Amino acid sequence: MEKQENVGHIVQIFGPVIDVQFPNEHMPAILSALEVKINDESIIFEVAQHLGEGIVRAIAMSMTYNLSKGLEVYDTGSQISVPVGKQVLSRMFNVLGQPIDGGKPLDSFIKNPIHAKAPTYLEQKATSEILVTGIKVIDLLIPFIKGGKIGLFGGAGVGKTVLVQELINNIASKHGGLSVFAGVGERSREGNDLYFEMKKAGVLDKTALVFGQMNEPPGARMRVALSALTMAEYFRDYENQDVLLFIDNIFRFTQAGSEVSTLLGRIPSTVGYQPTLSTEMGQLQERITSTIRGSITSVQAVYVPADDITDPAPATTFSHLDAKTVLDRGIAALGIYPAVDPLASSSRALEPNIVGKKHYLVAKKVVQILQRFKELQDIIAILGVDELSESDKQVVARARRIRNFLSQPFFVAQKFSGIQGQFIKIQDTVNNFDELLSGKYDNIPEEAFLYVGTIDQALEKAKKMGWSEKN
């Protein structure tokens, strides 16, 4: 006997949320996908609430311009599913897994639902292998763990997206594995730039891109990270791959959840965020993990509203991360990029039994000097450097050189800066900073350490500036 379609009718519309009347005995399950057909278009909704009397409330995954009350709504009987497997590589998708790159439609493919359970404790696997990024400040002070979760925190315009793109360039090209990029509520232009940069770098054939940009409704922005994660999970669990998952920007996931929560009639929690903030974040983050079959290493850009790191959105993300890289507007104002604040950043991998004793001691000494330099800032502002003790003068001079040497020219920014990008090996970074701490280069002008990769390049730059070893 042929299965009868479950059909309802729209009874109320408010923006991207609709109420649909179904027969009482055939209400669609929570998270089921609903479909509305208008002319040749199909709009997909996801069931969020059962209101009783056969009415369900659902969230749109695309624009709802042409909707009207009374339109028929079809229950698909399943969750939103996206294509997975080798066919998604080198392609660009929307939240529903539909290609948006103008390429040919996918041939036969497997589809997986975007909602899934996190791996159990028995399936998970702990690892302490360092992921080399080639970026000095990260490799030395905030080392990333393979299979870990990394957060890049910063306000507007401090360089989060550029840092994510540099990490994609450095890790994806050297790592050799597969990558999935989720563009969550960010600019369409950035997605376009990234697509062509990856194509140029030759890593597009190992990458899948999924976008729910800022012009799309909150339902799409809230679910696009799950669509990308579903693709990454398939590579981890069925292809036994080590996968890189880039999310830019995880704050927009929270922001979209807040918009939807208000439309669903929930009472807001702290600072206007949804009361389910911790639960939603946990459901996403707990799926991003390493298992006995493969690993997912996640790099997430996190916008910090009004530069307030204690805001509930970034604060909720903090608890899930292995490494926290904080970008600071004050450092960016000095013209030092990446504008990473070493004193606010941290990594659980910075332990002698993981990175080695020498690396650990050099990193701690660098942080100590920068901390002392920060403490002296008020005295310098009031009395000037001349009033400091000789030992403090030495700390200030050395800290300025260290601060400048933590800057680095990026490959993805060389068309703007005109400086060739640099990838620095961890051992070279540790040795260079060890020599800098020893006072060996105290006589080199501090400007020579800006935007160079190694000490040798700093010496070369100093000579071009008129410095000689006799000075």
UniProtKB/Swiss-Prot annotation:
It is a peripheral membrane protein. It is an enzyme of class 7 (translocase). Keywords: ATP synthesis, ATP-binding, Cell membrane, CF(1), Hydrogen ion transport, Ion transport, Membrane, Nucleotide-binding, Translocase, Transport. CDD domains: ATP-synt_F1_beta_C, ATP-synt_F1_beta_N, F1-ATPase_beta_CD. Its main location: membrane. GO terms for cellular component: plasma membrane; proton-transporting ATP synthase complex. Its EC number is 7.1.2.2. InterPro entries: AAA+_ATPase, ATP-synt_VA_C, ATP_synth_F1_bsu, ATPase_a/bsu_AS, ATPase_alpha/beta_chains, ATPase_F1/V1/A1_a/bsu_N, ATPase_F1/V1/A1_a/bsu_N_sf, ATPase_F1/V1/A1_a/bsu_nucl-bd. ATP binds at residues 154-161. It catalyses: ATP + H2O + 4 H(+)(in) = ADP + phosphate + 5 H(+)(out). Disulfide bonds: none annotated. GO terms for molecular function: ATP binding; ATP hydrolysis activity; proton-transporting ATP synthase activity, rotational mechanism. It is found in: Cell membrane. Produces ATP from ADP in the presence of a proton gradient across the membrane. The catalytic sites are hosted primarily by the beta subunits. F-type ATPases have 2 components, CF(1) - the catalytic core - and CF(0) - the membrane proton channel. CF(1) has five subunits: alpha(3), beta(3), gamma(1), delta(1), epsilon(1). CF(0) has three main subunits: a(1), b(2) and c(9-12). The alpha and beta chains form an alternating ring which encloses part of the gamma chain. CF(1) is attached to CF(0) by a central stalk formed by the gamma and epsilon chains, while a peripheral stalk is formed by the delta and b chains. HAMAP family: ATP_synth_beta_bact (MF_01347). Belongs to the ATPase alpha/beta chains family. PANTHER family: ATP SYNTHASE, ATP SYNTHASE SUBUNIT BETA, MITOCHONDRIAL. This is ATP synthase subunit beta. The lineage of its organism: Bacteria, Bacillati, Mycoplasmatota, Mycoplasmoidales, Metamycoplasmataceae.
